[in-house]
A protein has these predicted regions:
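Conserved tyrosine-mediated DNA breakage-rejoining catalytic core shared by Y-recombinases
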Residues: 6, 10-11, 15-49, 134
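DNA/chromatin major-groove-contacting recognition/catalytic segments
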Residues: 142-164
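C-terminal catalytic core of Y-nucleophile DNA break-rejoin enzymes
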Residues: 33-52, 65-88
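Short, polar N-cap/turn motifs at the start of nucleic acid-interacting alpha helices
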Residues: 20-23, 100, 119-140, 145, ...
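Activation on folded, globular domain regions of eukaryotic proteins
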Residues: 1, 24-27, 50, 56, ...
């Protein structure tokens, strides 16, 4: 839920610590692993509730600061590869085609949905934590319906309004 609603990279989700979430202001604050840049994102209620439920009811009682922990064997922070495997397994159960079962697909979908909801490119850039607008291009696929809304009608000869 968190990855889909925040667009965070797997490496950033697994590095989140208990102190990364400000429950009062409903914000997630982190330093991005890939860029080293600080990032503050809104904590959506559904994500916040899921994280709180995990912390209170599913997370082992440990001094480890990371929110998400590996529960098999020795308790340790979850790594990006394991997080990706969990996401892939859930996507498979949901019927997502194999070629689309990737943690990063959640990030691309997040960017695309923002674009579909007419969020400015500058804000999308900030939310994805990109320094350069060009690095956003792979995330901003335009849906077929949105493309059809931009097209102009094409009239052929003999049709009303067309040339003869």
């Amino acid at each position: 839920v968190l990855a889909a609603q925040s667009g965070l990279r797997a490496c950033d989700v697994v590095r989140l610590e208990l102190g990364s979430i400000n429950w009062r202001t409903r914000e997630i604050c982190l330093t991005q692993h890939k860029t080293g840049e600080p990032l503050s994102l809104p904590l959506e209620p559904e994500s916040g509730n899921a994280i709180a439920d995990y912390i209170l009811n599913g997370r082992p009682d440990t001094a480890i600061a990371n929110i998400f922990l590996c529960h098999t064997g020795v308790t340790r922070p979850l790594d990006a590869r394991s997080a990706s495997a969990v996401i892939s397994r859930h996507m498979k159960q949901a019927g997502v085609p194999a070629e689309r079962r990737a943690f990063h697909a959640l990030r691309r979908t997040f960017g695309t949905r923002l674009l579909q909801n007419e969020v400015s490119l500058e804000l999308i850039q900030q939310l994805l934590g990109h320094r350069d607008m060009n690095s956003m291009k792979p995330y901003l696929s335009i849906d077929e319906q949105g493309l059809k809304m931009c097209s102009l009608p094409l009239l052929f000869r003999g049709e009303v309004g067309g040339s003869k």
